[in-house]
């Protein structure tokens, strides 16, 4: 493998998004590729970067379709594992009257949650310029421990770690548990991407600037993006 500009680690799943109502009056959903880290890999590839994706999907119609989408998007999938035991994670997206999204996940024993560190071909990190991940893989299963181990591996190699909080509380046992593990991840983060809502979840402050300054003073990021 040639050295990659960006290696993304995390969830690759199917988003079923609403596209209207059928003739029978039932909601119609469209199957779309999803998963924040996979989206980053695809977007970076479109900009001309060399990218690779580390993850796990089911060896099913969804997982094979997702792998094909990454390949067509010029994302290296040598470190994307296909599981014969676990199924690809599915998410159904609902939009409220303001257009804001909410998610219903079908992820119990999903393939992405069962990714083990020893399954990953670490050669994908050789010469890598940036490593990207998010908190979704930390919510449950084997992938929680794997997330921290791969972040530490990247840092050991001198690779800057980019972390997207991407908080999905309905995937976690509790908000307190989510905050605990996300704060652990921040200790391994060089570049942080966080929404305003996530920022106030992690840091108190009268406004965004104050909350961001407090969080940055605690972890000393190279960059903090809100």
Q: What label would you give each PLM region?
A:
Residues 165-171:
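A short, histidine- and acid-enriched strand-loop-helix "catalytic/donor-clamping" loop
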Residues 45, 71, 152-156, 186:
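Anion (oxyanion) recognition and catalysis
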Residues 1-76:
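Glycine-rich phosphate/adenosyl-contacting loop at the front of the ribokinase-like
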């Amino acid at each position: 493998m040639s050295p990659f500009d960006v290696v993304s680690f995390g969830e690759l799943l199917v988003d079923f998004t609403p596209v209207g109502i059928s003739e029978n009056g039932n909601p119609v959903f469209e199957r779309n590729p999803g998963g924040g880290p996979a989206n980053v890999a695809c977007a970076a590839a479109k900009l001309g970067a060399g990218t690779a994706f580390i993850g796990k999907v089911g060896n099913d119609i969804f997982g094979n379709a997702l792998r094909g989408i990454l390949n067509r998007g010029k994302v290296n999938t040598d470190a994307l594992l296909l599981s014969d035991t676990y199924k690809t994670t599915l998410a159904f997206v609902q939009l409220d009257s303001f257009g804001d999204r909410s998610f219903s996940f079908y992820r119990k024993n999903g393939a992405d949650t069962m990714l083990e560190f020893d399954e990953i071909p670490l050669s994908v990190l050789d010469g890598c310029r940036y490593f990207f991940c998010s908190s979704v893989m930390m919510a449950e299963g084997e992938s929680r421990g794997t997330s921290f181990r791969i972040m530490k591996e990247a840092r050991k190699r001198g690779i800057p770690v980019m972390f997207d909080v991407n908080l999905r509380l309905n995937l976690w046992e509790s908000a307190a548990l989510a905050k605990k593990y996300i704060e652990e991840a921040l200790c391994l983060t060089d570049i942080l991407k966080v929404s305003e809502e996530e920022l106030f979840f992690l840091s108190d402050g009268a406004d965004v600037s104050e909350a961001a300054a407090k969080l940055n003073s605690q972890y000393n990021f190279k960059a903090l993006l809100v």
